Swiss-Prot record:
Its EC number is 4.6.1.1. One of its GO terms (molecular function) is metal ion binding. It comes from Leishmania donovani. The chain crosses the membrane at residues 35-55, 892-912. Glycans are attached at residues 422, 478, 497, 567. Belongs to the adenylyl cyclase class-3 family. Binds 1 Mg(2+) ion per subunit. Keywords: ATP-binding, cAMP biosynthesis, Glycoprotein, Lyase, Magnesium, Membrane, Metal-binding, Nucleotide-binding, Receptor, Transmembrane, Transmembrane helix. Mg(2+) binds at residues 938, 981. This is Receptor-type adenylate cyclase A. Residues 933-1087 form the Guanylate cyclase domain. It catalyses: ATP = 3',5'-cyclic AMP + diphosphate. PROSITE patterns: GUANYLATE_CYCLASE_2.
Length: 1380
């Protein structure tokens, strides 16, 4: 019996019930040898019955032998094994080491002197040899030892039970009647981890760490990858290295490959070995992974805790509460409200106080460091309390709790008298359909052995040797483990393992909370709360809803949204949203805006409630029913509040089109800003439709309706839901005559109707009232949100995976969706082939049976309906002509109109004849042989300013015109024309033009605009561009108030100047002069690339000044710049009219032809019209563009773009991707213009070549030494042309160096001596794709059939246009004109 008193490997004394008593008994026997004879005599003198009874009692109390195999041979896991054994011993101690019938429990421990501790099979067999009546084995510890034990035939044949082994891999969790697992399988822990990653964290980038060559992580990794793949997620990035006892450092190459993906979650699934410790240290300290969630299994929870606490104490990391998690099969020891935990605490307290075997003391190092918890040699006076120990050592305490649960189960089995007779009866008892309840609320089982199929069918547990059926997730907070709320996973008690139970996946529903709109915030928060309550998981194929919200501001909405969807999974966007937000292909369900908007015609946008178009259609179709309540006329007065100019146009078009469909008068439309009041805008004799409510409107409606008894007010459904509480509170105290004349629309059952008839007709209404029984919550917004939840629930049940694209597809595949008897749809999107051609339907809205109802009916459901609900057809017809007039009336009306028209025409003709010659043309340059300096101006972001500040822009534009016209007169220049807010001005001298341009800037700066709103608007525009353009630095938005006031004020005007010969023509219609040709084009395009407040002059205008004039002008040389349609770089000079002003880089070629106000999603037509007026396109090109537009007009815009692609490819015209800020219509027209220019250019070139070849009879080949008009002097051909990107520095030409424009002028002067051109074709490429001009030369092809065999076409780096230029030989004899 010596092995009962040897020290254990874990650092504790060998102890255990009968072992200590046996040692004391052995000493007494040695001392009693002298008394043997006396004892024999005493026995003989006793009676025989007493002797027989004593012998029987001793036999009944024969010890029950249990082997403790819960030990570790590695120093870094000694603490774990020790803690597990301490928990087990705690259970035995509190049962006084007694089995059934009072038999003592004797714990046997391995003998290090006799046993090879590394060979678990040898340890078991040696112990069995020493004690043949050994009943069972506790353990072993770790997967490798369990596998080794089960692989030994002698161990298996011995009939010994291996009870409560501590393992962490699924590979060893197989059926065997020799092992009895008392913890849930590792796969259950993994499933709770995956549920948290997929549903709560929604992380897109997951990493998985495992060590190969161990019984650990293989099956778990396969499950993780399969699950992520089935959910259409990216597979986990791996860190896998072979297990090694010597090479324990981190594999840097493997770690870098993982860390460079910036994982959001790292799953660590390995045994507690040294490699894991080093890996965790690297993960927690590397900047690429330090912010990631680290999730581990319960087996290495203590190791993770130790590494984290050690690094935190050393200052290597900062606290990361909430980012370190671990799965578990039992609650943390800090958990409250659990009966079994209270029992554990009571037994642990008794064990600490009385056993003498608890060797953890408060004056030990409180940090849980491996191998440092052995008892001190000197006796310690104070002991831990249970709570102190739990707080100081949460991970060790949790392992003790696991050991205690297993020990308590073993204790319960040993208390069965008929089980512990021998090993066979013990095994039979263990597998006899057992379920164990510990502490009153912790359940293990059901365990069962082999059984008949019928028994299994009737509910028996068969071939089941494991009992845990649930797991939870714990999180490290303030150096303690807490339960993550709602993080449990469990599977049915009737199942032995979790293989048939999959994780519950969540549908991620995102609500955007716009911080600038409280009503949208309320709607988003309400939806966020309603969805989980209204979503029935049981009806959704293992799915639940995960409702999340994102707080955003308008300026940064796109940036925050893009970050959200790139890092986290989003399946549905529901409710509040921004109209300008680009959501890509994410499914948008029932979007809600700050005020009603027209339907977004995109496939991924789905509307469940009535759209604005549907409501307008229903109103006009039921206008007779509305008029039955009052004597109001059929006129409608519409107030649009808070809408942009473009939105007003679009909504007005729908209003007029719908009114015309029903032959009703067009409505009057009034527009006001969001802050304006309705006072004075509502008509006392019309149907008033208010679109765009704000707080306080309810009281205004009530007062207005009370004052005028023959009017009504109509509000839209979305605003009814947002302002319902205010409307209800205001109108509930009004007379019914007032209540009856406030109208709205709804496709919902009446939410306040709680009658049995209504609930029988509408099951959704009963479901709604069950969730919200309080009548105060019976609102349209809550009912809408319940329907949204039901729609998602039904939609998810029809899909294989709840992924955003599949959900969108499911809407149109199913057509209609019914939830609790409420049908939404029919949804349809696409075309079907018919005998008459394709029939296309694009219907992404599903509201039907739309009713016009009053607030009176909302408050009192017994009020009858105004009219029966209807589903609008949304078919529009042209207004029908009225035939109410008699023929005589019509004839009289026609005659009157004719006479009036004649008189009007005569009057207008006379006025024009008298007044047209009044234009003063004295200042106009009229000599076509003299150079003219043309100056173009334009206001930056004018359209955006009109949309934002319509009340201010009229006066601002008038002031702008006055300033410029005064200066034009002052400098003796000539106003050629104005288009919108743009001027074209002609000057005889370049100095007058330059002085005029500079003084325009200074005058506008000093002008008293009377408001700072214009400057605030420009700041907002620049800040908006920061969010949409990479590397954009706002030039003025971040200036201090003093700096800004000195440099900027009011409208910002850009000016472009160019000097040259022009074609001057007198216009008989306008009685003025106009200027045509390259000079006009160059000046207009120079203005187009400038920024607001900037004056840019070409080198032609600059060098037209005298030396003294140039010396007196502050300027900055900007270097050669590319202009649209100009086949060479043009030297530019910035005139510093206001010293200190800083401008953004010159606008790129594509910016110059796109709308000016891209930051605000508006478009400027003035600049485009001005460019067209100065022959941006040649006459042939314009004609070709007109033909193309006419040919493609019958197709929808998207189809036009597709049909244009082959033509663009054939003609070598590039098609840049469309920006989201450019409409499809503008984009399509731009492509047609490009194609027209190319066709006209090539056609004209061919015509010239044909004529010249006919005259000369030959074609001169290109010279390899031809000048490159796009390169500066001295540049080699290999250098190529590198277009300046936005923001890149500009440099001027070297002193004395001639620019390409001068080379071009010299080149054109040689035209009379030329015979044949050398043709070079510069095809379109993006700047980022440029390498060098040498590379471009490799892609050479002939321009046309007239080219000689040695002529070649080369690619250059033009940013946006494809141009054809002439390359000139250094031999003047071969110089020719360039053509485009």
């Amino acid at each position: 019996m010596a092995m009962q008193i040897r020290p254990s490997l874990g650092g504790c004394l060998r102890h255990g019930g009968a072992g200590d008593h046996a040692a004391r008994r052995l000493s007494r026997l040695r001392a009693a040898k002298v008394f043997v004879p006396t004892a024999v005599v005493c026995v003989l003198l006793c009676c025989a019955p007493w002797v027989m009874a004593e012998i029987t009692n001793d036999a009944e109390r024969e010890p029950v032998y249990i082997l403790n195999a819960m030990y570790s041979t590695e120093a870094y896991t000694n603490e774990d094994a020790k803690a597990l054994w301490t928990g087990m011993d705690m259970a035995f101690y509190n049962s006084h080491y007694k089995a059934a019938g009072g038999r003592p429990i004797k714990i046997l421990h391995p003998d290090p002197d006799q046993d090879n501790l590394y060979d678990i099979a040898e340890v078991i067999l040696h112990s069995l040899a020493r004690q043949e009546k050994l009943l069972a084995v506790l353990g072993p510890y770790l997967d490798g030892r369990l596998t080794a034990a089960l692989s030994n035939a002698d161990v298996v044949q011995s009939g010994l039970m291996l009870i409560a082994p501590f393992t962490g891999s699924s590979g060893v969790r197989t059926w065997s009647d020799s092992v009895y697992f008392t913890r849930a399988e590792p796969m259950v822990e993994l499933k709770v981890v995956l549920m948290h990653i997929v549903n709560r964290l929604r992380a897109r980038r997951v990493a998985f760490m495992r060590l190969t060559g161990m019984h650990f992580g293989g099956e778990e990794l396969t499950y993780v990858q399969d699950t992520l793949t089935s959910l259409l997620r990216d597979p986990a990035v791996l860190y896998t290295v072979p297990y090694s006892e010597s090479s324990v450092e981190v594999d840097e190459e493997a770690f870098d490959a993982m860390a460079d993906t910036n994982p959001q979650v790292i799953i660590v699934w390995a045994a507690p070995v040294q490699q894991v410790i080093y890996f965790l240290e690297k993960v927690l300290t590397d900047p690429r992974t330090s912010s990631a969630y680290v999730i581990s299994c319960s087996m290495i929870q203590r190791v993770v805790f130790d590494v984290y606490k050690r690094l935190l104490s050393a200052g290597s990391i900062k606290p990361q509460d909430g980012r370190i998690l671990a799965s578990a099969t039992t609650s943390p020891v800090s958990g409250e409200g659990l009966k079994y935990m209270e029992v554990l605490k009571a037994q642990m307290s008794n064990y600490i106080e009385n056993s003498g075997s608890f060797d953890y003391y408060p004056d030990d190092d409180s940090t849980e460091t491996l191998g440092r918890k052995a008892r001190s040699e000197a006796p310690l006076s104070r002991k831990y309390t249970v709570d102190e120990f739990f707080q100081a050592h949460p991970s060790i305490a949790k392992l003790m709790a696991l050991g205690w649960l297993s020990g308590t189960l073993v204790q319960q089995t040993l208390e069965q008298t008929d089980w512990i007779v021998n090993r066979s009866t013990y095994k039979a008892g263990l597998f006899n359909q057992n379920r164990f309840v510990i502490g009153g609320d912790y359940v293990l089982g059901d365990y069962g052995g082999p059984c008949e199929p019928l028994a299994q069918f009737l509910g028996a547990s068969c071939y089941c040797n494991q009992g845990g059926h649930s797991s939870i997730l714990t999180v490290l907070q303030n150096a303690s483990w807490d339960i993550v709320p709602d993080s449990s996973f469990k599977y049915p008690q009737s199942e032995c393992n979790s293989s048939k139970s999959q994780i519950v996946k969540a549908v991620s529903v995102l609500a955007l909370l716009n911080q600038g709109y409280p009503k949208l915030i309320d709607a988003g928060m309400q939806l966020n709360e309603v969805l989980p309550h209204a979503f029935d998981d049981n009806l959704c194929k293992g799915y639940k809803v995960s409702s999340i919200f994102l707080r955003v501001e308008t300026a940064k909405a796109q940036q925050l949204f893009d970050a959200e969807v790139s890092n986290y999974s989003v399946d549905i966007i529901a409710g509040p949203i921004f109209q300008a937000l680009d959501v890509g292909e994410i499914f948008v369900l029932n979007p809600l805006y700050n005020h009603p908007q027209l339907r977004t015609e995109k496939r991924n946008y789905v509307y469940l409630m009535p759209t604005l178009e549907q409501q307008i259609y229903v109103m006009y179709s039921k206008i007779d029913a509305l008029r039955t309540r009052t004597d109001v006329f059929e006129d409608t007065a519409v107030v649009l509040r808070g809408y942009s100019a473009q939105e007003v146009v679009e909504i007005s078009e729908i209003l007029f089109k719908t009114a015309g469909t029903f032959n009703l008068p067009d409505p009057s439309v009034a527009t006001i800003s969001f802050t304006d009041s309705l006072r004075g805008l509502l008509s006392p004799r019309a149907i008033n439709v208010v679109i765009g409510m704000k707080d306080g409107d309810s009281a205004h409606f009530a007062n207005f309706l009370a004052k005028y008894t023959d009017v009504m007010v109509v509000v839209c459904f979305d605003e009814l839901t947002m302002y319902y509480e205010e409307l209800r509170a205001t109108f509930s105290v009004q007379p019914t005559s007032v209540q009856a004349r406030l109208m709205s629309f709804s496709s919902l059952p009446l939410w306040t109707d709680a009658s049995a008839e209504a609930k029988a007709r509408w099951p959704i209404l009963g479901h709604f009232h069950k969730i919200f029984p309080d009548p105060i919550n019976h609102t349209p917004s809550l009912l809408r949100d319940v329907i949204i939840a039901g729609f998602i629930q039904e939609l998810v049940s029809t899909t294989t995976v709840a992924e955003t694209k599949l959900l969108t597809n499911a809407v149109y595949i199913n057509g209609g969706v019914t939830t609790y008897g409420f049908t939404l749809g029919n949804f349809e999107w696409g075309c079907t082939a018919t005998t008459s051609g394709d029939s296309c339907v694009y219907k992404n809205y599903g509201a039907s049976n739309i009713e016009i109802l009053s607030i009176q009916r909302m408050l009192d459901p017994t009020v009858p309906q105004l009219s029966s609900p209807s589903t609008p057809t949304m078919e529009y017809r042209p207004r029908q002509r009225s035939h109410a007039l008699t023929p005589a009336q019509r004839n009289g009306l026609i005659a009157g109109c004719v006479v009036g028209a004649v008189v009007l025409i005569a009057t207008c003709t006379l006025l024009l004849y008298c007044c047209m010659d009044n234009r003063n043309n004295d200042a106009a340059p009229k000599d076509g042989d003299e150079p003219v300096t043309l100056l173009f101006t334009d206001i930056e972001s004018s359209t955006a300013l009109w949309a934002a500040l319509p009340q201010l822009m009229s006066d601002a534009i008038a002031a702008h015109h006055r300033v410029i016209r005064q200066l034009v007169k002052k400098y003796g220049c000539y106003e050629v024309k104005t288009i919108g807010d743009s001027f074209m001005i002609a000057c005889r001298s370049a100095h007058s033009a330059v002085s005029l341009a500079c003084e325009i800037q200074t005058k506008l700066l000093k002008h008293d605009w009377g408001t700072e709103a214009l400057d605030r608007a420009y700041r907002e525009f620049e800040l908006a561009r920061v969010d949409t353009l990479d590397d954009y630095e706002p030039p003025t938005a971040r200036l201090s108030e003093e700096e800004y006031a000195a440099l900027w004020c009011g409208l910002r005007v850009r000016v472009g100047i160019h000097t040259g010969l022009t074609d001057i023509r007198y216009d008989e219609v306008t009685k003025g002069y106009d200027y045509y040709g390259d000079t006009s084009n160059m000046a207009a395009r120079t203005e187009a690339v400038a920024n607001g407040g900037q004056v840019v002059a070409t080198e032609a205008a600059w060098w037209a000044l005298s030396n003294d004039e140039r010396a007196g002008i502050a300027h900055t040389a900007m270097g050669p710049q590319g202009l649209r349609g100009v086949p060479f770089a043009v030297e530019m000079f910035q005139l510093n009219a206001v010293p200190g002003r800083r401008h953004a880089a010159l606008r790129t070629e594509i910016e110059a032809i796109l709308p000016d106000d891209t930051a605000t999603d508006t478009a400027s037509s003035a600049a485009g019209a001005l460019l067209s007026s100065v022959e941006t396109m040649s006459d042939p090109a314009a004609g070709i563009a007109f033909v193309l537009a006419s040919c493609f007009a019958p197709y929808p815009v998207a189809q036009r773009v597709r049909e244009l692609q082959p033509l663009l490819s054939k003609w070598g015209v590039g098609a840049p991707p469309r920006s989201r800020l450019v409409s499809e219509e503008d984009y399509c027209q731009g492509l047609m213009n490009r194609l027209a220019i190319r066709i006209a250019t090539v056609s004209q070139a061919r015509l010239r070549l044909t004529r010249e070849d006919a005259a000369d009879g030959k074609f001169k080949l290109a010279s390899s030494e031809a000048l490159n008009p796009l390169a500066r002097e001295g540049d080699s051909a290999a250098g190529g042309v590198r277009p300046r990107l936005p923001g890149s520095p500009v440099t001027s030409l070297p002193a004395g160096g001639s620019s390409s424009m001068r080379e071009w002028r010299v080149f054109t002067r040689l035209m009379n001596d030329t015979q044949h051109p050398s043709v070079t074709h510069l095809s379109q490429q993006r700047p980022s794709n440029l390498t060098s001009f040498t590379e471009a030369q490799d892609a050479a092809f002939p321009l046309n059939a007239h080219c000689g065999p040695e002529s070649r076409v080369e690619n250059s780096g033009a940013d946006d246009e494809e141009i054809v230029i002439v390359r000139v030989s250094r031999n003047p004899h071969y110089a020719r004109h360039a053509f485009e």
